[in-house]
Amino acid sequence: MKRTATLLIALLLALPFALAQESPDYLQIAGKVIDGATGKPMHYASITLAGTNISNVSNAEGFFSLKYHPKTLPDALVTVSHLGYATITLKLSDFGPYDSEHPLTIRLIPVSINLDPALIRAHDPAELILAALYRIKQNYPTKHIGMTAFYREMVKKGNTKYLTMNEAILDIDKAPYGSYQNDRIGIYKGRGSQNYDSTDTLFVKYQGGVVSIFQIDQAKEPFATVSLNEITHFYEFKSEPSEFNGDRMLYVVSFNQKPGLDEIYFRGKVFIDSESLAIGRVEMAMNVEGREDAADIFVIKRPNDTRFEVKSADYVVNYKPVDGKWYYDYAKMEIKFETRKRRSLFKNHFTVMSEIAITDHQENPPKIDSDARVKFRDQMTEKVSAFTDGNFWENYNVIEPDASIEAIIRRIVRQLKKHNLE
C-alpha cells in the first residue's frame, strides 16, 4: 500500500461579524473593472456603496458583485477606486438588473503625476515611514470595531489542481490600534472541500490561515516584523514616484533589508497618504530566494524524506479611509514552494493562498466566546461544511471567484449532490 505523507504549512510573517437580518432578501449588482487605457482587467479595485460601510473588491478578472438592502434608493452612489487611477462614481440604477454573464464594464482612467523631483527628495523616506508609524493612533481606530469579512484560502498543486479550498464569512472584533490586544475572529458560516486522490503522495495542510491574514496588518503589528526603534537598523528606504488613489496623493517608499543580515526579512513598498500620513497600502515579499532555511519559517511538520524549497512569499494589505479614520480593508498572502522526495528527479509545485475582504463594519463589535475563537493551530478544513449549496452565501458579500475557481466550485457542488443522491 502506498503511504501518504502529510505536510503542515502556515503562512506566517517570520516567526464580521455577520449581522442578523430580519429578511434574507437582497438586491445585487455586478460589474467588471478594466484599465481605461489598455482594457486589461483590474484586480483589487475597491467598490463601496456610498453612505454605508458595505464594500467589496474585484477579483483577478476585474469582476465583482455587491449585495445591498432592497430599500436602498436607486440613485444611491457606488464608488469604484484603485491605486493609480481616478475614482469613478456611479448610481445603482446604472448597473441595471443583476447579470453575472453581462456585467457593467467600468473603465478607470490612469492618473499620472508630475512632481518636482526636488519636492520628492525633500521627504526623507526613512523619516516618512517613521512619521506614519508614529501617527497610527491618530489615523486608525483606537477602540474595538465590529467587522464582517469574506475569507478564502486554497492549496493548489501545479497550475490547475486545487487540493483544498475553504471559504467563510467571518465575525471580527478588531482590536484597537496602538494596543497589544489581539483581534478576535469567529466563523459565522463556511464551506470547504478537499480533492486528494491516489496519485497524491503528499497531503498539504494549511494551518492558521485566518489568524495569519490579520498578522500582516502593518498598521497594527510590528512593521515587517521589527519594532519601531529597530526599523532603520534592519531596513534601508528609498523614495519612489508618488501615486494617486482617486483624489488622494500617496507618497511611495520602497524598502529592503540591509545587506549583510543573516536573518530573512522583507522588501516591498509602502503607500502613505500625503495629508494624514496614514499607511494606505503595503506590498511586500519575504526575501526567500536562494535561502534553504526559509522552509523552517513556514513548515510546521514535514516528512523526513522530502526536500522543501520556498520559491516566493508575497503579501498585500490595503486600508481605506472612512470618516477620518483608516480601516483594514483587504489582504492577501501567497506562498509558492516546491517539494522533491529524496532520490527522486521529479518536483511538485504548490501554491498556498489566502485572502480577505472586509465587507462591512460598525462600532459595536460582536461577542466572540473564547471557545468559538479561531486559533492559530486551527485548520479551516475541519471547521467548515461541504460545498453542497449553490446559494450558500445568501445576502453576504463575497469576493467573486475567478473563472477557474468558479468552475471548480460548480464541479464540487455537482459531485456532492450526486453523491448525496446515491
Q: Residue ranges of each PLM-predicted region?
A:
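Structural motif
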Residues: 24-42
